[in-house]
Curated annotation (Swiss-Prot):
It catalyses: L-glutamyl-tRNA(Gln) + L-glutamine + ATP + H2O = L-glutaminyl-tRNA(Gln) + L-glutamate + ADP + phosphate + H(+); L-aspartyl-tRNA(Asn) + L-glutamine + ATP + H2O = L-asparaginyl-tRNA(Asn) + L-glutamate + ADP + phosphate + 2 H(+). It comes from Streptococcus uberis (strain ATCC BAA-854 / 0140J). Transmembrane segments: none annotated. InterPro entries: Asp/Glu-ADT_sf_sub_c, GatC. Allows the formation of correctly charged Asn-tRNA(Asn) or Gln-tRNA(Gln) through the transamidation of misacylated Asp-tRNA(Asn) or Glu-tRNA(Gln) in organisms which lack either or both of asparaginyl-tRNA or glutaminyl-tRNA synthetases. The reaction takes place in the presence of glutamine and ATP through an activated phospho-Asp-tRNA(Asn) or phospho-Glu-tRNA(Gln). Its EC number is 6.3.5.-. One of its GO terms (molecular function) is asparaginyl-tRNA synthase (glutamine-hydrolyzing) activity. Keywords: ATP-binding, Ligase, Nucleotide-binding, Protein biosynthesis. It comes from the Bacteria. Belongs to the GatC family. The gene is gatC. This is Aspartyl/glutamyl-tRNA(Asn/Gln) amidotransferase subunit C. HAMAP family: GatC. PANTHER family: GLUTAMYL-TRNA(GLN) AMIDOTRANSFERASE SUBUNIT C, MITOCHONDRIAL. Heterotrimer of A, B and C subunits.
């Protein structure tokens, strides 16, 4: 399945990324190769093959889920240069507000 440069540009726009024409072309080629490989893997007959979810022998190795007291909010806000309604106020990083 061929991934077109237009599709790459569309996804880049949605992701708020900017690519040169050369990069767009390279991404289209690379993504086409990846999709082709996945399609090839989909053709492999896995009938009768046991499902493998991990190669590790361990299962459900987790620490106990115990509640711990966190740092006091007032202490955290002592180092904050600017706050608003109990939130840390930071400079905007998207010019148009970030609407997709």
């Amino acid at each position: 399945m061929k991934i077109s440069e237009e599709e790459v540009r569309h996804v880049a726009t949605l992701s708020k990324l900017a690519f040169s024409e050369e990069e767009t072309s390279q991404f289209a080629t690379t993504l086409t190769k990846i999709v082709d490989m996945v399609e090839l893997l989909n053709e492999v007959d896995t009938e009768g093959v046991a499902i493998t979810t991990t190669m590790a022998d361990r299962k459900n190795v987790m620490r106990p889920d115990l509640a711990q007291a966190g740092t006091n909010r007032e202490d955290l806000f002592k180092n904050v240069p600017e706050k608003e309604n109990n939130f840390i106020k930071v400079p905007a990083i998207l010019e148009d507000g970030g609407d997709a």
